[in-house]
Each structure stands twice: as structure tokens, then as C-alpha cells.
Amino acid sequence: MIQLNYNKILLSILALSPLSSMAQQNLTQYVNPFIGSEDHGHVFVGANVPLGAVQLGPSQIAQTWDQFNGWDWCSGYNYKSKEILGFTHTHLSGTGIGDLNDIMIVPANGKVQLKPAEFNKMGTGYGSSFKKENEIAQPGFYSVLLDDYQVQANLTATERVGYHQYVYNKSDNAHLFIDLSFKMNWDKTTDSYIKQINDSTFVGYRFSSGWASDQKVYFALKTSVPIQKVQFYEENSQKLGSSTVKGQAIKAALFFDAVKNKTIEVKVGLSSVSTTNALENIQVETPNWNFADAKKQANDKWNSTLNKIQFEGDADTKTIFYTALYHTYFAPTIFNDANGDYLGTDKQVYEKQDFTNHTVFSLWDTYRGLHPLMNLLEDRKINQDFIKTMLAIYQQQGKLPVWHLQGNETNTMVGLPAIPVVADAVIKGILDEKDYELAWEAVKTTAMGYENGLKFVRDLTYIPIDSMDHESVAWALEYAIADYSAYKMAVKLGKTEDAAYFEKRYKLYEQYFDKEVGHFVGRKANGEFRRPFNALMAKHRENDYCEGNAWQYTWLVPQDVKGLINLFGGDKNFLKKLDEFTTMSSDLGGEASNDITGLIGQYAQGNEPNHHVPYLYAYAGEAWKGSALARKAMMEFYTSKPNGLCGNDDAGQMSAWYVFSAMGMYPLNPISGVYVFGSPMMEKATITLPNDKQLTIQVKNQAKKNSYIKSIKRNGASYSKSFITYEEVLKGGTIEIEMSSTPNKNWGKAPQDRPIAVDN
């Protein structure tokens, strides 16, 4: 009887476990890390773990003389390159600006080369050519044969440690070359330092100024075999007679016996605080010399993350989907040490904090889809860590982050994009109630600033082009989204007066609508709209928009689609304008921003302000058109090839759009908790939710030609709505979607079945 009761208890526990109903599958096999590494995708290729601080991978020669001035090497890697200079420990993924690529290590032999090689002239400096057939990239692992050195390089990583394994097939003057002056983009080393502790341990730092204006990277380096000799250099001159060197551009060659030890392993721990912490990170995360085990652990971490969604479909779609999901976990990266210490934006060290601090907040991009995706997939702890980091940044710099990079505020892009993320965490109950007041203080203080036109918004008026000669409309529309978020948060917290004020502010977008041309247009202080006016003009930083034109910004009102429809005079005119937008010529008239890519008509899937556009149709009763547009964007602009992303992945937002859309839904209004149905690409997807329940989406009649939703069932019952809410999703259960090659124009058409019935 006792044994029987025990078995019953055990079975009950297993029944509640997500793994009991959804056993772990081998999903890392479907990831192709090279997708998005060619052309404008700018994704990181190398070894890391989900959200890891260390992103260890190859750095190449940025071809700054091409038509994009080297733009396509922002991550440090581009698939079309045929050379590798060496391996660095920090990288950005999908960004439109380059930086990082810190702590360069070159596994070399022969003459010590002090400078990176020039393009197509590998003998002029360090680096090696390689063949694509000898390059392997998998989640948590990167491998390549460096032809010029005849060194097999294998890389893996933990959260804070890069783990190298080098097999030397040429032993002549074998050495590891460390270049602390190596830089990416306009970055520049401002101070550097290396100290030898013993024959297998070195510590140091690299301080630099670039996109991150005051970056500090401390490191500790340990080798598996003794270093027999060390040569230190300042720039290109050797420095003798010391085990400690300091200067603006310190370099070192660490020589070892490659005849006796053909294989050398290297661990590099990083810290923003100290070399002591960097050493401790190595001890905590990689206490043993076992590369195979470290590689397996990295793979297991990725596999566990990918299993949050079990997605069934054809092989190609599965590869695209899981690679997209993989890319959504490259940022925001961990930015603290194993002991909880981190460097704040105010350059003070915060010791032993009770949350995991993060950085690389590309918020103008990620507030739209990536953070809503994290809210569906990750437990409260991780999402709380994101918010607690933002609140700490607020306390340190006086406002919420805009684009936070390695302890630095870059103020890149427009608007106040942290506010929607913070507000959403409060509205959905993700943040602990004890933190609500600080969160509100941060939101309100940030929204009540004076910079970048906010002084006009505070007074409930438009930003005149007399005061802001470019991007005024972009700033204003993004402010309106943030103000809506503040309004909803104030309502949640019972702050009636604040709610009334921000309700007025989020509708200020209406003041930019020029009925004469049917677009949002910049206005002079005297009330006149900008003339002459060209709705297609998209020259970078020379119009009223940011990385777009008037056509593309006409739809950037996700917080108030009802109000936007009313500006056009109702559903009919709104749909007519939307149809024109998605079917007109894609010609931008020359000198357009490089960020405007992936065009269907003027709809630009390659840049974030249009990511919600396909799902607007459902608000006006023609959800079927949105299904067709979303399917077309997925089929044309997401492929399994190296150039398989039509634009910058933008720290995972481009990929997050695909993850949502391929499952057949998207959060058009990122904080409303409403997901609009589109056109699922799979046969079945099972999502493990933060509450450990599962939501299974089953698709009938899945085929490339079947873009349209014919009908939906929810837990076996007919479901006529073109949307589903966050609260409903968290209940788990099933959604059955039947697809068709012809549209069901009545599906989701009734006013009560449109998202507008509950959103706004």
C-alpha cells in the first residue's frame, strides 16, 4: 500500500511536469548558425550559450571599401569572407553598428606578426585563410581549420568563459598571440594591461571607446600546458624585462612546446569588474580541463532552451524556425560575474546583487516582439532580471535605457523604448509588486524629460520641425507608444491623474496626420505641414522619419489602431490605403537608407517599424489579407541560406518576428496582451509556458499554397475570433487551425471577432 501511494504521488508529479508530456528532443541539430551571416543579417557566428556574456568567435577583415563601407561586418564576421584574423570573446549580433570583438587571440606559428593582415594579403600580418568545407558552426560550438597556420581551432563557451582548443599540425615557433589593440568599427583601445601570474595564468584588461564610449573588459587567461616564453609588445615594439606591461596597445606572444603538446587548451574568463572576478568566473564555470564536456554542456543548454517550443514541419521550415529561435537568445546578454558583481552605467561596482544584470538592450527593436516572446517562453526570474537591470540603470543614469551596451548608454535610435517593456512587466504581473513604485518612478521620470523634443510632448503639443529638423515624426510616434504604455501602467496602479495625462499624450500622434496627403508629416511651429512633401523620400537622417519614409511610418500606431482607422475615415479607406501600401512600387527614389529592405510594395519587413503591418488587416475585418502578407514575408525574406535574413537581425527582433509569425500569431500592440492570428508555417507547435502548462497549436492542411485560415477551434470548440489574449494563452490547451488556399473572408470579420474589440 505504501509503495502504491508512492507511485501515485510520483505519477502525479510527473503529470504536472512539462517534460512528462513533452520529452526533450534533439533540436540543436536543426539550427544553422550561418543563416543571416551574409549580406545585411549581421548575425554572430561562434560559440556561446543562451544570453551568455561571452560570445567567442572569429573576427575577420571588414571590407570597408565596399559600397556599404564595411557595414556587413558589424558582428566581426561575414559568410562571404575567406579569412580569419583570430578569435575574440565579445560580439554583437544583427546590429547596424559595429563594436566589441574584444580580447583577440590568434593561434599562430612561425614569425610573430604584430598587426592584422590586409585583405587578400595574408602575409602582411596575423590571420589565416580558410575553406568553407572546413568550417563548422553549431549551437555552443565553432570549429575551423586555419590553413596558413595548419591549426585546427575548436571553440565552446559558458556564460562568462570562452574555452578554446587548438590542435597544432605545424610546431614551428608555436605561440598564442594576444592583441588588445584589435578593434571593430570606430572603437579604439584607450588603455590595456597584461600580467603573467605563472607559467599558465595571465590576467589583464582592455579599456576602449567606441559605440560603447567607456568600455571595460577585464580578463583572465589559463592554458592547459606551460608557457615557456613570453614576449610583450607596445604597439609594434617589443617590451623587455617585465612580467607586467601596461599601455594603450599592449600585445603578447605566449610560446609553448607544440612538439610535446600538439593540443593546447585555453580558458578566458571575462569580467566588467576585475581580473580577480574573471579568474573566479573560470573556477566556477569551468573548473576542469575537459573541452568535450564543456561543449556538451553548451549544447545541452541550447537544447533545453529550444525545447521550449517543439515545432513540427518540413525540414527547411524547421531549420529556419529553430535558427530564428536560437538567434532570439543572443541578447540581452549577461553582464555580471558569477558572484553577482557588475559595473554600473555610473561606473560604480555593484557587489553581490540578487539579480542577474544584463546588457545589449536594443530596445527600439526588441520591445516590439522579442520581449513579448520572452514573456511567453521564460520564467519570471529571467524577465524580472531584464526589468531589474533597467531599473538599476534608471537609478544610475536618471532615465531608463535607450540602447544599453556594456555599461554604457549609447542613446541610439528614437523614442523611449524601455517604457513599453517595463510597463508590460507590471501590467502582466511579471515584476514583483514590491518593485512597482520604483518601476513607475522610472517610467514617469523618463517620460517627463526634456531632451529630443520631449519638452513639447510634456506640453501636449507636436514637435515642430523648426526645433527638430529631421526625424520629428519618428520621435513623436515612438513617444506615443511609450505614453500609451505609461497610461496603461498608471491605470493598473490606480494612478488616476497620471493616467488621464498620459492618455492625452498617447493620442498626440493625431496632430501629425496631414489629411491632404494621408500621411504623418512634420509640422512647423506655425502649424503648417512640411512642404514640399515626398512620401517616398527615405534618405537617411534627412526626412521626418527614422530609417524609413512617410509610407512606412503611416502605420506606426500599434497602441491605437482604432484611432488610426478613424483618421482615414473608417475601415474602407483604411484598408484601401493599406492595400495601396503593400502593392505599390517598391522604388524608394534613390539614396534610401540601407536599413529599408525586404520590400513588398513599400512594406519593409527588413526594418522594425513595419513588423506589425500584416496584422493590421484583422483590426479592420480583413484578417485574410494579413495572413497572405505574413506568409509572403516569411516565404520571401526568411530562408535557410547564409543570406537568409533580408535585414539586420537587430539583436534578435527580426528572428522573434519569425518565431511568432511561423506559429501563426503576433503581438501587434506589444503591451496589450493580444496576439493576432496570421498564417502558421508548421504542422504542430507545442509551447511550454512560464506556468509549466502547454499550448499546442495544431495545423490542418498545411501547405505552401495554403496561406489562409479557414477556421479555428479552441479546445475543440469553434473559435471565430482573429486573435487570442495573453490570459487565454496562459491557460494552455489546444488551438486547431485549418488552412486553405482560398480565403475565408468572413473569418474574423464580425466586429466582436476583431482584435479592436478588446485592444484599445
Feature locations, PLM:
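Extracellular attachment/recognition segments
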Residues: 708
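Beta-strand-rich recognition domains
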Residues: 696-701
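Accessory carbohydrate-recognition regions in carbohydrate-active enzymes
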Residues: 24-420, 424-477, 490-511, 517-518, ...
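ATP-dependent phospho-/nucleotidyl transfer catalytic cores
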Residues: 482
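Bacterial Sec-dependent N-terminal signal peptides
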Residues: 1-25
